[in-house]
């Protein structure tokens, strides 16, 4: 059976066909619409899936935000151009006439990355550092989603009570500091208005401010990981996302984590499936998990 997997992120929309063998075929992408209207997202999704849906028997969606009763509820609306609510499952069933499931993108990615781990691991946490900061928790070999879909939204835990206001409404969230959007928002002077990718490029060229912004992000993430270790006693933490997988970033996080007391150390791994983890995880969950 072939699954049409869809990944809805703050920067891009991706879709692919995934067979029962887990192989990804016909992957395609579109920019996430910047408009605040549900119609803009619906139109973009229609354009994305229309060439693929005839080859699939079901749809599995991995999306940023809280997924509750098949709908997307944005915890940080800025990550989707201000969109607060979107009926994901209903919309895709109407567009494709196929049975559809939906799950948070980081939760889906966590499940895919868990399948790739070697050894006897039952406790794992996945963190994605990209436009925002998200996560997924596997405990006892099972993915935690929570009754309201909030489980794993670790980017909205407190990093600095005097830090910037986050799009979720809290002050000083990890996401407001460590994410690509947070890195860019803190840039000043010649870097003001630059995106995270540009800031990483400047850091590689020796720009002191760019390097400080990236170190600030990595230090914040390391402290989050120490908190996660204290909370879950996980056996490993897998890091993904465009910032998390940027050259040199994970090594910086490891350096800052090593400065924490030994009890809070944990093995850090780069995401195995990289940018395809959300797609694959959603398809795997459609195969055998009740959401």
Curated annotation (Swiss-Prot):
Binding site for Zn(2+): 156, 166, 168, 173
Binding-site residues for ATP, renumbered to this chain: 5-12, 132-139
Enzyme kind, highest EC tier: transferase
CDD domains (alphabetical): ASKHA_NBD_ROK_EcNanK-like (cd24069)
Keyword terms of this UniProt record: ATP-binding, Carbohydrate metabolism, Kinase, Metal-binding, Nucleotide-binding, Transferase, Zinc
Annotated pathway: Amino-sugar metabolism; N-acetylneuraminate degradation; D-fructose 6-phosphate from N-acetylneuraminate: step 2/5
Catalytic activity of the protein: an N-acyl-D-mannosamine + ATP = an N-acyl-D-mannosamine 6-phosphate + ADP + H(+)
A GO term for molecular function: ATP binding
GO biological process, alphabetically ordered: N-acetylneuraminate catabolic process
Entry EC no(s): 2.7.1.60
PANTHER family noted in UniProt: N-ACETYLMANNOSAMINE KINASE, ROK (REPRESSOR, ORF, KINASE) FAMILY
Purpose: Catalyzes the phosphorylation of N-acetylmannosamine (ManNAc) to ManNAc-6-P.
Family: Belongs to the ROK (NagC/XylR) family. NanK subfamily.
Quaternary structure, from the entry: Homodimer.
NCBIfam families, sorted: NactlManKinNanK, PRK05082.1
Protein name stated in the entry: N-acetylmannosamine kinase
Gene: nanK
């Amino acid at each position: 059976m072939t699954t049409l997997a869809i990944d809805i992120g703050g920067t891009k929309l991706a879709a692919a066909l995934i067979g029962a063998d887990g192989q990804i075929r016909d992957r395609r992408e579109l920019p996430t619409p910047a408009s605040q209207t549900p119609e803009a997202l619906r139109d973009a999704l229609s354009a994305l899936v229309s060439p693929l849906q005839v080859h699939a028997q079901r749809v599995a969606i991995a999306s940023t935000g809280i997924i509750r009763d098949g709908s997307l509820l944005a915890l940080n609306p800025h990550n989707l151009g201000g969109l607060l609510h979107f009926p994901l499952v209903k919309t895709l069933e109407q567009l494709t006439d196929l049975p559809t499931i939906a799950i948070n993108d980081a939760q889906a990615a966590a499940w895919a990355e868990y399948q790739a781990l070697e050894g006897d691991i039952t406790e794992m946490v996945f963190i994605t550092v990209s436009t925002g900061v998200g996560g997924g928790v596997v405990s006892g070999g099972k993915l935690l989603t929570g009754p309201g879909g909030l489980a794993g939204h670790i980017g909205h835990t407190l990093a600095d009570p005097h830090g910037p206001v986050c799009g979720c409404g809290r002050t000083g969230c990890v996401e407001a500091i460590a994410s690509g959007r947070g890195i860019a928002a803190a840039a000043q002077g010649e870097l003001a208005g630059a995106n995270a990718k540009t800031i990483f490029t400047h850091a590689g060229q020796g720009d002191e401010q760019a390097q400080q912004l990236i170190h600030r992000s990595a230090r914040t993430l390391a402290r989050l990981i120490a908190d996660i270790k204290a909370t879950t006693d996980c056996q490993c933490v897998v890091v993904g996302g465009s910032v998390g997988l940027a050259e040199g970033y994970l090594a910086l996080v490891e350096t800052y984590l090593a400065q924490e007391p030994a009890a809070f150390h944990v093995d850090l791994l780069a995401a195995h499936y990289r940018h395809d983890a959300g797609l694959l995880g959603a398809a795997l969950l459609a195969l055998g998990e009740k959401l």
